[in-house]
Amino acid sequence: MISDPIADMLTRIRNGVMARHEVVIMPASRMKQYLAKVMKQEGFIAGYEVIGAKPKRQLKIVLRYDEGGASFVSGLERISKPGLRVYVQRGEIPRVYGGLGVAIVSTSKGVMTGSQAWRQGLGGELLCKVW
């Protein structure tokens, strides 16, 4: 059993990028789908889909590379962990690499980027940073 499924997801994406894989497959959950949706909206991944039946659903993430073979994901960092949750208010949401990356925040209105949460005046759990 995995103690931190979100960290496992980020690690699988990181390993897939380093190995130059086109897709990575992992066990699916709603939170992972929300994270994949935000990453797709921000252009870090090419797409995602849920495959399989209910008890053993899998999340398939299609990684994105440019013409030179460089990945659009340079780095991923888990912030809030099961043993130490990190919550931020609107003004405490960090900028990632001067706006080149995104902070992903779980708010009362759903999972969104830090800038979207800031614009809506929301704080929440700071899940991870992607750049």
From Swiss-Prot:
<keyword id="KW-0689">Ribosomal protein</keyword>
<dbReference type="InterPro" id="IPR000630">
    <property type="entry name" value="Ribosomal_uS8"/>
</dbReference>
<dbReference type="InterPro" id="IPR035987">
    <property type="entry name" value="Ribosomal_uS8_sf"/>
</dbReference>
<dbReference type="GO" id="GO:0005840">
    <property type="term" value="C:ribosome"/>
</dbReference>
<dbReference type="Pfam" id="PF00410">
    <property type="entry name" value="Ribosomal_S8"/>
</dbReference>
<keyword id="KW-0694">RNA-binding</keyword>
<protein>
    <recommendedName>
        <fullName>Small ribosomal subunit protein uS8</fullName>
    </recommendedName>
</protein>
<dbReference type="GO" id="GO:1990904">
    <property type="term" value="C:ribonucleoprotein complex"/>
</dbReference>
<comment type="similarity">
    <text>Belongs to the universal ribosomal protein uS8 family.</text>
</comment>
<dbReference type="GO" id="GO:0003735">
    <property type="term" value="F:structural constituent of ribosome"/>
</dbReference>
<keyword id="KW-0699">rRNA-binding</keyword>
<keyword id="KW-0687">Ribonucleoprotein</keyword>
<comment type="function">
    <text>One of the primary rRNA binding proteins, it binds directly to 16S rRNA central domain where it helps coordinate assembly of the platform of the 30S subunit.</text>
</comment>
<comment type="subunit">
    <text>Part of the 30S ribosomal subunit. Contacts proteins S5 and S12.</text>
</comment>
<dbReference type="GO" id="GO:0006412">
    <property type="term" value="P:translation"/>
</dbReference>
<dbReference type="GO" id="GO:0019843">
    <property type="term" value="F:rRNA binding"/>
</dbReference>
